[in-house]
A protein has these predicted regions:
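Intrinsically disordered, low-complexity segments enriched in serine/proline and basic residues
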Residues: 1-12
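Surface/interface-facing alpha-helical segments and adjacent flexible terminal/loop regions used
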Residues: 11-179
Length: 179
């Protein structure tokens, strides 16, 4: 399935074919993870989940990279529970789970590198958005030619953004970068 920028998601059914470099497959894997870690949305994102496409594509990329199946086993298992489900019900359930995992003063999972590092260094109530770790990530991305859009108001070091950036680097940093 070709890249569909209007969806922000692309399939990789042909990834095992000849002519795909390891970097291409690695870039695809990172982009799939970026999509999977973004906040759940109606439309193409949830359709990729309930159709099973997201789980299949992650499994194919993982196999093409010769990763241990255990590397994405739990993630794939979680995604597969929504396969064939009603999209609206699945979206509601996934949003509830996202809130449980990532939101609040003491989230189960820290989805921002800067706040995760602050907690690792003993900061009880880390500052989100602007902290020295997040600024370092933004500076590194800028050195690589990736600059956030003027009105971008999310943490640049959210996992989904960093996965997207790793995909960009795996592709050789040659993708067109929005100004």
């Amino acid at each position: 399935m070709p890249w569909r920028p209007e969806m922000g998601y692309h399939g990789i059914a042909c990834v095992g074919g000849e002519g795909f470099s390891v970097n291409t497959v690695l870039g695809t894997m990172f982009k799939l993870l970026a999509v999977a870690w973004r906040p759940p949305t109606a439309g193409p994102w949830i359709e990729a989940v309930v159709s099973g496409m997201m789980a299949r594509d992650l499994a194919e990329a993982s196999a093409a990279l010769e990763l241990s199946p255990a590397a994405i086993e739990a993630f794939s298992a979680a995604l597969s529970t929504y396969e064939g489900a009603d999209a609206e019900e699945a979206l509601h359930a996934i949003r509830r789970e996202e809130t449980r995992l990532f939101i609040g003063s003491d989230p189960v999972v820290e989805n921002s590198e800067g706040t995760w590092l602050q907690r690792a260094h003993g900061v009880a109530h880390p500052i989100r958005m602007i902290n020295n770790h997040s600024v370092a990530v933004a500076d590194f991305m800028k050195e690589c030619g990736v600059v956030r859009k003027g009105k971008y108001n999310d943490c640049i070091d959210y996992l989904s953004n960093e996965f997207d950036f790793c995909g960009y680097l795996a592709d050789g940093g040659t993708l067109s970068v929005p100004e």
